[in-house]
Amino acid sequence: MCGICGFTGKDNTFLPSMVKHIRRRGPDSEGNFSKNNIHLAATRLSIRDLKNGNQPFVHEDINFVTVFNGEIYNYNYLKKKIQEKGYSIKTNCDTELLAPGFKIYNSEFFSMIEGMFAFAIYDVTNDQLTISRDRYGIKPLYYSLINNELFFSSSAKSIYNLNFFQKRLNVKSL
């Protein structure tokens, strides 16, 4: 089990308090990334490629950054498809497949993944953040728009414990 969180906005001081609530999900490593008003963090429980899978995973050759929680069961198949398109995969870490797969196939890549997952991919060049989870929601991904900024996390506590988050019932949705 790993944890991911992040948000958009100028003030990156929220990241440490968000990470506090996902830390229990990933005891092996912790990292963060901030650029162009995008702030990402991950805590990792190492399952695949114990040495090379620390996150956020920076794909320097295509200028993407990824945080990932999950497991890709058809890893070998997807790795081969991505390599056939000319991309180099340097590790055996699931996380490394996400950005080049997304770059090649766009959001169609998400339906090609067999597994359980939640992730965020930041395209630095185009300043575009994409978040996704598996279709069954096995891996949690909570999100909220607060003051026109996106906040997301593997743990709802990362969001609702922010001092400006207002907890209220949406009666219309009942």
Regions found by a protein language model. Name each.
Residues 1-174:
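Cysteine-centered catalytic environments shared across enzyme families
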